[in-house]
Amino acid sequence: MPEVDAIRAQLFALQDKEYQIFNSRLMPTLPSETVIGVRVPLLRKLAKQLADTPEAEVFLQELPHFYYEENALHAFLLEPVRDYGTALAETERFLPYVDNWAVCDSFSPKVFAQHKLELLAAIRRWLGSDRTYTVRYGIGMLMRYYLDDAFRPEYLAWAAAVHSEDYYVNMMRAWYFATALAKQSAAALPWLTEKRLDVWTHNKTIQKAVESYRISPEQKQALRALRIRSQKLCEERRV
């Protein structure tokens, strides 16, 4: 389609070849030839320029995209959608095509913040998906919207109930629990003291929390003492 070709040409006009090499290394799940090399601020600027244009409407219908930057641009074009139903439907249509952490973690339609109660049903669906980045996105939405005033302790159980061997899913689970330790410590800490998480997520949560500026030195010291040294030790402690 000429509209899609025109947008692709705009992306290549913004290409930085040195950045392409750097960015490709950050996304090892993507073939390097699918990364153009456009910096995120420029992608967001282009998304603002294209928002609500006929060209953008055509582009959003053209899935799958080939380039990482096309997927990132697609994600950024969804953020200003004002109608909740449309934003949710378009997000769910797009998620099966998200194939890397950078796009997955980069977007959330702003209207989601005004519909937290309704969004929970979608999050439950996403957490139950067999697609890596759909699950990761669901956990990310729990982290973004439900660790402050909308927090409920059962949401921790939702994230913990996700069972996956995928690194990108489990890393997001750890990130979620580390953030929960900073924002909802009383509810989150028992998940570590009682060793309710798998060993990898348990230890990675502690690592990320210790790296966080939002965790006090005293909390970090206590968390370090909770590290599990081996799978065998964890099993012995649960007997």
Put a short name on every predicted segment.
Residues 1-239:
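Alpha-helical scaffold domains
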